[in-house]
């Protein structure tokens, strides 16, 4: 599927007219999605039914398009595409050239929640464009087709105030020859770009992904506030995220099996990397492939406290031929500004011991607190 996007300026004017909402997402997002007064609840059993429900919510009773949407939406998805996911798993290198499949939420600001039922699955993505007040929860996304058409699992373009929570996103961390740069067949798990800001990514289980996520599409797309918390990343290659400018706060995440690089802080971005657990990781915190506009990071209360911990947790470092900075001395290179939201991180050890009981689908949206660490 291909879509023409309105200009960023037009999208921002549309979004600016909408009131903010006030959920506690544990991060920069403050949206309840469709969980507001006047919401219409719908159930969908397929990608097409989700598309049809969203299209119907964008017009009034006379069929005239309503700016920002006619009413808030709560969509419960109960479909199962395990057969497509299993077929893709058997033909990994055949996915790149297939048509991308996805639900597009475009110019919708009334509030929308898409939430999967336990046991549901999707071989299609959710693409959020020029919208705001969007929540995606308890969705299981596997082996997205259409890498050549930017077939991300979740894509957020020019859309503030989005919450991506308690999902599972997976593919195969594998390179297929014949694709650009011998790249994998699959695109990103969660890309946040083109002016998107105030986004929270929480309690997701992301595994087998080569390019996990962008924070910014280019060296000029640099202004955003993002929070990543209580996510599990296993057997992933890079972009955790690839940060082009802006602010990234990452706390209480578990990183196990980074095969390329983790945080790549570029274009003078600033990252607060707090109370996370790292193991079996190559270049977990770095700045590279960015001439001299390196970003900075503040390292706080992670399981790694000094280079003497690297061997214990199997942390290794590589040195590319291009200019770069690695956190191989495990020291902060900058100071993160004050944070506008309240949060209470648990210890990195608790993340290691307990987070798997809370992150991903089928966990009833449960959250990890200090009381659970005992």
Swiss-Prot record:
GO cellular component terms, A-Z: extracellular region
Chief localization: secreted
GO annotation, biological process: pectin catabolic process
Alphabetized SUPFAM superfamilies for the sequence: Pectin lyase-like (SSF51126)
Superkingdom per UniProt: Bacteria
Annotated catalytic residues: 239
Protein name as annotated: Pectate lyase 2
Reaction(s) this enzyme catalyzes, per UniProt: Eliminative cleavage of (1->4)-alpha-D-galacturonan to give oligosaccharides with 4-deoxy-alpha-D-galact-4-enuronosyl groups at their non-reducing ends
Cofactor: Ca(2+)
Cystine connections: 93-176, 350-373
Cited InterPro entries: Pec_lyase (IPR002022), Pectin_lyas_fold (IPR012334), Pectin_lyase_fold/virulence (IPR011050), PEL (IPR045032)
One GO MF term: pectate lyase activity
Subcellular location: Secreted
The enzyme's E.C. designation: 4.2.2.2
Keyword set, alphabetical order: Calcium, Disulfide bond, Lyase, Metal-binding, Secreted, Signal
Pathway: Glycan metabolism; pectin degradation; 2-dehydro-3-deoxy-D-gluconate from pectin: step 2/5
Role this protein plays: Involved in maceration and soft-rotting of plant tissue.
Similarity comment: Belongs to the polysaccharide lyase 1 family. PLADES subfamily.
Cofactor note: Binds 1 Ca(2+) ion per subunit.
Signal sequence segment: 1-22
Residues involved in Ca(2+) binding: 150, 152, 187, 191
Pfam families linked: Pectate_lyase_4
């Amino acid at each position: 599927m291909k879509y023409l996007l309105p200009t960023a300026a037009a999208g921002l004017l549309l979004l600016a007219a909408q009131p903010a909402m006030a959920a506690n997402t544990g991060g920069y997002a403050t949206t309840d999605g469709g969980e507001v007064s006047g919401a219409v609840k719908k159930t969908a059993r397929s990608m097409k039914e989700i598309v049809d429900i969203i299209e119907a919510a964008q017009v009034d009773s006379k069929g005239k398009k309503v700016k920002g949407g006619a009413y808030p939406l709560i969509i419960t998805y109960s479909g199962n595409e395990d057969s497509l996911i299993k077929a893709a798993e058997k033909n990994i290198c055949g996915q790149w050239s297939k048509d991308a499949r996805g639900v597009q939420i475009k110019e919708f600001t009334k509030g929308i929640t898409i939430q999967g039922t336990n046991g549901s699955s999707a071989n299609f993505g959710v693409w959020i464009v020029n919208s705001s007040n969007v929540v995606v929860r308890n969705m299981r996304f596997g082996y997205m087709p259409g890498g050549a058409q930017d077939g991300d699992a979740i894509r957020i373009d020019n859309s503030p105030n989005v919450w991506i929570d308690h999902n599972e996103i997976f593919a195969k961390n594998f390179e297929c020859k014949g694709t650009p740069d011998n790249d994998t067949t699959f695109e990103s798990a969660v890309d946040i770009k083109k002016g998107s800001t105030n986004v929270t990514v929480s309690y997701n289980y992301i595994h087998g992904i080569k390019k996990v996520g962008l924070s910014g599409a280019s060296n000029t797309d640099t202004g955003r506030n993002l929070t990543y918390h209580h996510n599990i990343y296993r057997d992933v290659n890079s972009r955790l995220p690839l940060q082009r400018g802006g602010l990234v706060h990452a706390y209480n995440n578990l990183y196990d099996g980074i095969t390329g690089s983790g945080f790549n802080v570029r274009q003078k971005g600033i990252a607060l990397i707090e109370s996370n657990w790292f193991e079996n990781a190559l270049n977990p915190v770095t700045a590279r492939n960015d001439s001299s506009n390196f970003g900075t990071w503040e390292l706080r209360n992670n399981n790694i406290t000094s280079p003497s911990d690297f061997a214990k947790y199997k942390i290794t470092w590589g040195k590319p031929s291009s200019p770069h900075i690695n956190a191989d001395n495990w020291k902060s290179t900058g100071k993160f500004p004050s944070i506008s939201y309240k949060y209470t991180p648990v210890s990195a050890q608790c993340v290691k011991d307990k987070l798997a009981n809370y992150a991903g689908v089928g966990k009833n949206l449960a959250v990890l607190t200090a009381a659970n660490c005992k």
